[in-house]
């Protein structure tokens, strides 16, 4: 995920947490709020009680990668925060990807892009 696609300032995190809506999953919590620009920005929060700095950074990298893989499917115009929960520590990669996708769908931020049919691809 590029730097311009990330939430960075504490003010932005506070705005999303206080003024947005929240959905939960055993691995992650998703908070969303309308963005000021027509793009998607993501932030990730991992509390200190979830492990050492090395572990917390690994969790952030995993969520960032799962989000990057579906970034084009997220409807623009939203700021998104993923909060890592304790169950994340033992989750497999597939479970993490599924949790990210499911939360985005619950929040109605999932934008299915039309896939061209076989006939369209081959003329």
Curated annotation (Swiss-Prot):
Record keywords: Endonuclease, Hydrolase, Nuclease, RNA-binding, tRNA processing
Gene coding for it: rnpA
Family that this chain belongs to: Belongs to the RnpA family.
Reactions the enzyme catalyzes: Endonucleolytic cleavage of RNA, removing 5'-extranucleotides from tRNA precursor
Keyword RNA-binding attached: yes
SUPFAM superfamilies associated with the record: Ribosomal protein S5 domain 2-like (SSF54211)
GO biological process: tRNA 5'-leader removal
UniProt KW tRNA processing keyword: yes
Function in brief: RNaseP catalyzes the removal of the 5'-leader sequence from pre-tRNA to produce the mature 5'-terminus. It can also cleave other RNA substrates such as 4.5S RNA. The protein component plays an auxiliary but essential role in vivo by binding to the 5'-leader sequence and broadening the substrate specificity of the ribozyme.
Classification lineage: Bacteria, Bacillati, Chloroflexota, Chloroflexia, Herpetosiphonales
GO MF annotation, one: tRNA binding
Gene3D superfamilies given in the database record: 3.30.230.10
EC category: hydrolase
Subunit structure: Consists of a catalytic RNA component (M1 or rnpB) and a protein subunit.
Pfam families referenced in this protein's UniProt entry, alphabetically: Ribonuclease_P
Superkingdom of source: Bacteria
InterPro entries the record matches: Ribosomal_Su5_D2-typ_SF, Ribsml_uS5_D2-typ_fold_subgr, RNase_P
Name this protein carries in UniProt: Ribonuclease P protein component
Cellular component GO terms held in the UniProt record: ribonuclease P complex
Its EC number(s): 3.1.26.5
Organism of this sequence: Herpetosiphon aurantiacus (strain ATCC 23779 / DSM 785 / 114-95)
């Amino acid at each position: 995920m590029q730097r311009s696609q990330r939430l960075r300032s504490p003010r932005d995190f506070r705005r999303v947490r206080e003024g947005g809506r929240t959905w939960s999953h055993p691995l992650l919590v998703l908070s969303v709020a309308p963005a000021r620009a027509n793009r998607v920005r993501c932030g990730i929060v991992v509390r200190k009680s979830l492990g050492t700095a090395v572990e917390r950074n690994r969790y952030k990298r995993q969520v960032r990668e799962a989000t990057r893989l579906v970034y084009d499917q997220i409807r623009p115009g939203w700021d998104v925060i993923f909060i890592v929960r304790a169950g994340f520590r033992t989750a497999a990669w597939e479970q993490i990807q599924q949790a990210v996708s499911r939360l985005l769908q619950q929040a109605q931020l999932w934008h299915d892009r039309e896939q061209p049919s076989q006939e369209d691809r081959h003329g």
